[in-house]
Swiss-Prot record:
It comes from Mus musculus. This is Interferon alpha-1. Residues 1-23 form the signal peptide. GO terms for molecular function: cytokine activity; cytokine receptor binding. InterPro entries: 4_helix_cytokine-like_core, Interferon_alpha/beta/delta. CDD domains: IFab. Keywords: Antiviral defense, Cytokine, Disulfide bond, Glycoprotein, Secreted, Signal. Produced by macrophages, IFN-alpha have antiviral activities. Interferon stimulates the production of two enzymes: a protein kinase and an oligoadenylate synthetase.
Amino acid sequence: MARLCAFLMVLAVLSYWPTCSLGCDLPQTHNLRNKRALTLLVQMRRLSPLSCLKDRKDFGFPQEKVDAQQIKKAQAIPVLSELTQQILNIFTSKDSSAAWNTTLLDSFCNDLHQQLNDLQGCLMQQVGVQEFPLTQEDALLAVRKYFHRITVYLREKKHSPCAWEVVRAEVWRALSSSANVLGRLREEK
């Protein structure tokens, strides 16, 4: 019995081993959820991207503001948290549920909720440790403006199937970018 308890304790510790040196401890499952969310986004595709070429739009993803090379490790958490929250806002809207397979959408949103909880846990660890530098505020504002452009686009296109397909592909790009940021920061460890 003692060995079983020791084994379970080791498993618990390993599952919360930091995934990167961000000034906080993200559980290993955070990266797995991110990969799963990307996979779910691919599975959610309902239309061929070729059929929606006329609806494509450059939303101006703020790559330079989100790039791990440009922001410090501790600044990455609020930016990634904002990015995740904004994606969740789009996919939990009432108009979103009509556009997607409900099972895939629910799984996707659940993964995002868990990622957001991980990131917010890190934010709580950072409270009082650092003030938000101006570059971080710029990055947060750039992320908010980016998602505002996406929301306006969906409204202008009346949440059409092609508009949702364009947004799905764009969100995949944003989530991929956040995974790349975490990967680069982990390499700096």
